């Protein structure tokens, strides 16, 4: 049986705006239940919404970042459904005229680079949050603090073919929204949520069949996304062999994912567009977006995005795939690296130092690069001192930790503690001769092929100089002298 997976993702991103989408209530996470509500987000009679301008500008920026076509006319619609946490009985959303459409982004997986097309990006408001208590009376509570929070929904085309590609796509989207400072994109607090639509395209005897679509909701981690996709792929293959049900005969079902069992569970048959009874929202007028306004947002708020940054960093500095992926995980880390690289002749060495020593300190202190007070130029200078032999690689790590603790440059510590490495050839040669004269047995062992004899003599050289001589140069001079003995 020949088949391919058809996977489309619906991603909801809660924007980090100061206020909600259609009222002036604060848009914060958590807090006392129902403490950030008003007649508008509670849907009380007579309360009229107004559009948050930042919601529109954020959608435009997201459209630019995803290479989308941006509409000049903004229309809002009412999407009707009866959930307890939807106080108005409808959600303000966009139906047939999303603000952005026909976009794309690139992802990178083990198979290489791939383009994923984006069908649409539309604006909408969030619902409240239901809290179910497993007590004797089985009570449920509703917190409306989240009701009306500003959302963007990004809907991909079914171009994704595996769980690996799905996770890569989600990572790419999350990086874009974080780079643009539009959202924290945290699955833990619900500001980044994903639904998976998945079915199979099966070819039998040159005839194509599509299996019923499963929409898997409430996936709370990238790991769950991959596991759910892998399970559905296996399940749909088995069901096709047993029942041969097609998309035309069954349609679409809404599924949940049981993390503990690793299986998808049927929740309900999926509503169709007509079930939502979309109508244009009569309380919100059409908004005309001038072309200059759309372009102005791009010119003033657009930044270099991660995919482009990785290509540039590799071409400009010769960094590895691992280096650029790690550096571009945070746009501020990229900035820190490039500032440090300005003061060193070896940018790759600077990158290695940041990705090992600097990130180690950040992880230990549980802080981000913005909270790291040591100027980037100090890192570049430290690396340069190692390269030119001013200090040894071993002592450099001790110097770095003191730099971090005291927030001073490496040269300050080197001068204070007289740590500068000795690279004077004549001085080192005199020490080597001393060690050779004092250790004739080690010379004999070396002649017999015992490599540990060289290590012993190098140790003696370092002991005599308190570890301050250049070890590479010392080893070179020692080996030359041993050849002459």
UniProtKB/Swiss-Prot annotation:
Q: What class of enzyme is it?
A: ligase
An individual GO BP term: glutaminyl-tRNAGln biosynthesis via transamidation
Q: Does the keyword Protein biosynthesis apply?
A: yes
**Keyword Protein biosynthesis: yes or no?**
yes
Q: What is its EC number?
A: 6.3.5.-
Q: Which GO terms describe its molecular function?
A: asparaginyl-tRNA synthase (glutamine-hydrolyzing) activity; ATP binding; glutaminyl-tRNA synthase (glutamine-hydrolyzing) activity
Keywords of the record: ATP-binding, Ligase, Nucleotide-binding, Protein biosynthesis
Question: Signal peptide position in this chain?
Answer: none
Reactions it catalyzes:
L-glutamyl-tRNA(Gln) + L-glutamine + ATP + H2O = L-glutaminyl-tRNA(Gln) + L-glutamate + ADP + phosphate + H(+); L-aspartyl-tRNA(Asn) + L-glutamine + ATP + H2O = L-asparaginyl-tRNA(Asn) + L-glutamate + ADP + phosphate + 2 H(+)
Q: What does this protein do?
A: Allows the formation of correctly charged Asn-tRNA(Asn) or Gln-tRNA(Gln) through the transamidation of misacylated Asp-tRNA(Asn) or Glu-tRNA(Gln) in organisms which lack either or both of asparaginyl-tRNA or glutaminyl-tRNA synthetases. The reaction takes place in the presence of glutamine and ATP through an activated phospho-Asp-tRNA(Asn) or phospho-Glu-tRNA(Gln).
User: Subunit comment for this entry?
Assistant: Heterotrimer of A, B and C subunits.
Family stated for the protein in its record: Belongs to the GatB/GatE family. GatB subfamily.
PANTHER family registered for this protein in UniProt = GLUTAMYL-TRNA GLN AMIDOTRANSFERASE SUBUNIT B MITOCHONDRIAL AND PROKARYOTIC PET112-RELATED, GLUTAMYL-TRNA(GLN) AMIDOTRANSFERASE SUBUNIT B, MITOCHONDRIAL
What is the protein's given name?
Aspartyl/glutamyl-tRNA(Asn/Gln) amidotransferase subunit B
């Amino acid at each position: 049986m020949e088949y391919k997976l058809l996977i489309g993702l619906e991603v909801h991103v809660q924007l980090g705006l100061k206020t909600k989408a259609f009222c002036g209530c604060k848009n914060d996470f958590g807090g006392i239940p129902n403490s950030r509500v008003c007649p508008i987000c509670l849907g009380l009679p007579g309360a009229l919404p107004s559009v948050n301008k930042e919601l529109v500008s954020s959608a435009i920026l997201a459209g630019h970042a995803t290479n989308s076509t941006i509409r000049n006319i903004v229309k809002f619609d009412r999407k009707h459904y009866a959930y307890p946490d939807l106080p108005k009985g409808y959600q303000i959303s966009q139906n047939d005229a999303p603000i952005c459409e026909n976009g794309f982004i690139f992802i990178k997986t083990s198979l290489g680079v791939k383009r994923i097309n984006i069908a649409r990006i539309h604006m909408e408001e969030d619902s409240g949050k239901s809290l179910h208590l497993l007590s004797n009376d089985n009570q449920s509570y509703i917190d409306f603090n989240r009701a009306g929070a500003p959302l963007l929904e990004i809907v991909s085309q079914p171009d994704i073919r595996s769980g690996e590609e799905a996770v890569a796509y989600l990572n790419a989207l999350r990086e874009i929204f974080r780079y643009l400072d539009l959202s924290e994109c945290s699955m833990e607090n619900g500001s980044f949520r994903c639904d998976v639509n998945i079915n199979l395209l099966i070819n039998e005897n040159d005839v194509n069949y599509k299996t019923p679509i499963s929409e898997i909701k409430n996936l709370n981690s990238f790991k769950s996304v991959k596991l759910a996709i892998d399970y559905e792929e296996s399940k749909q293959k088995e069901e096709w062999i047993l029942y041969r049900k097609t998309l035309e005969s069954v349609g679409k079902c809404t599924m949940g994912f049981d993390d503990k069992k690793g299986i998808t569970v049927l929740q309900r048959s999926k509503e169709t567009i007509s079930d939502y009874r979309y109508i244009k929202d009569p309380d919100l007028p059409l908004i005309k977006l001038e072309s200059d306004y759309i372009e102005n947002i791009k010119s003033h708020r657009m930044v270099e995005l991660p995919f482009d940054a990785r290509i540039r960093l590799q071409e400009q500095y010769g960094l590895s795939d691992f280096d650029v992926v790690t550096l571009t995980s945070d746009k501020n880390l990229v900035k820190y690296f490039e500032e440090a690289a300005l003061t060193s002749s070896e940018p790759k060495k600077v990158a290695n130092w940041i990705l090992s020593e600097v990130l180690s300190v950040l992880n230990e202190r549980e802080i981000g690069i913005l909270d790291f007070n040591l100027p980037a130029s100090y890192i570049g200078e430290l690396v340069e001192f190692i390269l030119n032999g001013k200090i040894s690689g071993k002592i450099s790590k001790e110097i770095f930790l003191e730099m971090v603790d005291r927030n001073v440059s490496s040269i300050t510590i080197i001068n204070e503690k007289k740590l500068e490495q000795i690279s004077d050839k004549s001085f080192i040669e005199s020490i080597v001769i001393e060690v050779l004269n004092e250790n004739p047995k080690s010379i004999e062992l070396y002649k017999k092929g015992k490599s540990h004899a060289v290590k012993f003599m190098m140790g003696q050289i370092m002991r005599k100089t308190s570890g301050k001589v250049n070890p590479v140069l010392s080893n070179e001079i020692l080996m030359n002298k041993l050849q002459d003995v």
